[in-house]
Amino acid sequence: MADDNVSFTDQGTAVGDEKKKGGSSAMLDMLGQLEKKETKKKGKKNKKSKKKAKKGKTKKVRKADKYESQNFLFRVEGAMFCAGIIVAMIMLFVIIIYGIITSSQTGGQFNRYMAPLF
């Protein structure tokens, strides 16, 4: 097949297929021959070739996402934001609890408690 001097613009001799393919060229004929499956021979040699083909497989490597690092930063930023909100709420509750405790100690009169400051 490699020794054939074929021009890729030559028309092939297709009988009855000209309407379907719109005319065939030598290039299409060669590609058609390459695409045909070879007949399998039964025997031990065929089994060995299958085993070799199975051994040649490679593991699939995880392809890094284009935006993976950006998504990671968004997750970290979101976690920090939520943590900030939680810390602010805890501080607010501490101030409210401290106010309740001091108001109960002073009998609800903050002027008496604040008198040393004024």
From Swiss-Prot:
Record carries keyword Transport: no
Topology relative to the membrane: Single-pass membrane protein
Transmembrane segments annotated in the record for this chain: 81-101
Bias type Polar residues, positions: 1-12
Database matches in InterPro entries: C27D6.3-like
Primary location recorded for the protein, binned into one broad class: membrane
GO cellular component: membrane
Keywords, ordered alphabetically: Membrane, Transmembrane, Transmembrane helix
Feature: compositional bias, Basic residues: 39-63
Keyword Oxidoreductase: no
Cellular localisation: Membrane
Location of region: Disordered: 1-63
PANTHER family (alphabetical): PROTEIN CBG20624 (PTHR39355:SF1)
Protein name (record): Uncharacterized protein C27D6.3
Organism: Caenorhabditis elegans
